[in-house]
From Swiss-Prot:
Keywords: Chloroplast, Membrane, Photosynthesis, Plastid, Thylakoid, Transmembrane, Transmembrane helix
Protein's job: Seems to be required for the assembly of the photosystem I complex.
Superkingdom to which the source organism belongs: Eukaryota
Membrane topology: Multi-pass membrane protein
The UniProt record lists the keyword Transferase: no
Pfam families registered for this protein in UniProt: Ycf4 (PF02392)
Spans through the membrane: 23-43, 70-90
Full protein name: Photosystem I assembly protein Ycf4
HAMAP family according to UniProt: Ycf4 (MF_00437)
Keyword Repeat: no
One GO cellular component term noted in the UniProt record for this chain: chloroplast thylakoid membrane
Length: 187
């Protein structure tokens, strides 16, 4: 189910992509094929034969071949995990702000089980502020949080693009003016 963004004077609907990002598809393919190569080379070192394009003449099975098999199996499981989260759409959902009813609904899909559907409802009048979080360094990250009385901060969106500070500020300003609340976190 694809949700289209909707903005008006009294209603906002913001879709959240979650784990279905292009970079996750890239990494799941890359990890799978790299791990598959490790596994094939490990098997070739055990059988002392060439399979496909993989040659393991100079690799002794114990310890190098066994370690390559282990890394290959671990990488394949990791790529299956990434595919599983993307197929299920973990982290995807929507943020709904409705001034007519005076409520905010935040919905996300989780992993299968008891808490597969994560839904948070609150009143607009209970919102204290919009908080901007920015972390620089090796893995930069930016996020918008909703600060609500009596609840922990709720992440609205995570933006992993390090050069898009203007977009983060713009989104926070639009949402804060829509909800008529202050912005925190920018110095």
């Amino acid at each position: 189910m694809k949700i289209k963004p909707c903005k008006s004077q009294v209603f906002r609907l913001e879709p959240i992509i979650g784990s279905r990002k292009y970079i996750n598809y890239f990494w799941s393919f890359s990890i799978f094929f790299g791990a598959f190569g490790f596994l094939i080379v490990g098997i070739c070192s055990y059988l002392k034969k060439e399979l496909f394009f993989f040659s393991a003449e100079n690799i002794i099975f114990i310890p190098q071949g066994a370690v390559m098999c282990f890394y290959g199996i671990a990488g394949i499981f990791l790529s299956f995990y990434l595919w599983f989260t993307m197929i299920l759409g973990v982290g995807s959902g929507f943020n709904e702000f409705n001034k007519n009813e005076g409520i905010v609904n935040i919905f996300r899909w989780g992993f299968p089980g008891q808490n597969r559907r994560i839904k948070i409802c609150c009143l607009i009048k209970d919102i204290k502020s919009i908080r901007i979080y920015i972390r620089d360094g090796i893995s930069p990250r930016s996020a918008l949080y909703l600060k609500i009385r009596g609840m922990p901060d709720i992440p609205l969106d995570v933006i992993e693009d390090r050069f898009n500070l203007n977009e983060i500020e713009k989104r926070a300003t639009e949402l804060a003016s829509f909800l008529r609340v202050p912005i925190e976190g920018l110095e």
